[in-house]
Regions:
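Acidic/histidine-rich catalytic neighborhood of metal-dependent amide-processing enzymes
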Residues: 105-159
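Acidic/His- and Gly-rich active-site-bordering loop/insert found
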Residues: 1-102, 118-125
Length: 159
């Protein structure tokens, strides 16, 4: 399936996932993993015992001198905040985009993921690793889960 490389279209899709901390992120993780696979990456969903997951996508030859880009898929709750529009619908007002997570951190996820099809993935001489975690907003729980299972699932990563 060919997906739209437009980062704004992907951001709209990502913002629509209500990935409030402590809630499942499996749907957004599946979209991001699929995009990475379509771009030539080897992906893994690293699931935790509470039904959460992290996404790991690797491109290029395995190495310890490549680069890791890391981000999180969860957002802070919207309860008690004065939103003038649905926080889980991306809207444009006066040339700016508004939606929960558009700046922290779904905008970054959309930008990186949308750029993947334009990268010369098969020409990489060093590894590029994308790590998208869950529950960063509430104590970096996804990162802790990743660290606990690092050697078992990831092996050496770029330093």
């Amino acid at each position: 399936m060919k997906t739209d490389p437009d980062p704004i279209a992907l951001l709209k899709e990502l913002v629509a996932f209500p990935t409030v901390s402590h809630r499942p992120v499996s749907a957004i993780a599946a979209v991001l993993a699929q995009r990475a696979e379509e771009a030539g990456g080897q992906t893994e969903l690293l699931e935790s015992s509470d039904g959460k997951c992290n996404v790991i996508a690797r491109f290029g030859p395995p190495s310890t001198d490549g680069i890791v880009l890391s981000g999180h898929m969860d957002v802070v709750p919207t309860e008690g905040q004065d939103w003038t529009s649905d926080p889980f619908k991306l809207v444009e007002r006066e040339g700016r985009l508004f939606g929960r997570g558009s700046a922290d951190m779904k905008g970054f996820l959309a930008a990186v993921t949308s750029a993947l099809p334009q990268l010369p993935i098969h020409q990489l001489k060093r590894e590029l690793v994308l790590i998208w975690t869950h529950d960063e907003e509430v104590g970096c729980l996804g990162s802790q889960h990743l660290a606990d299972r690092w050697a078992e699932h990831l092996g050496p990563l770029p330093s």
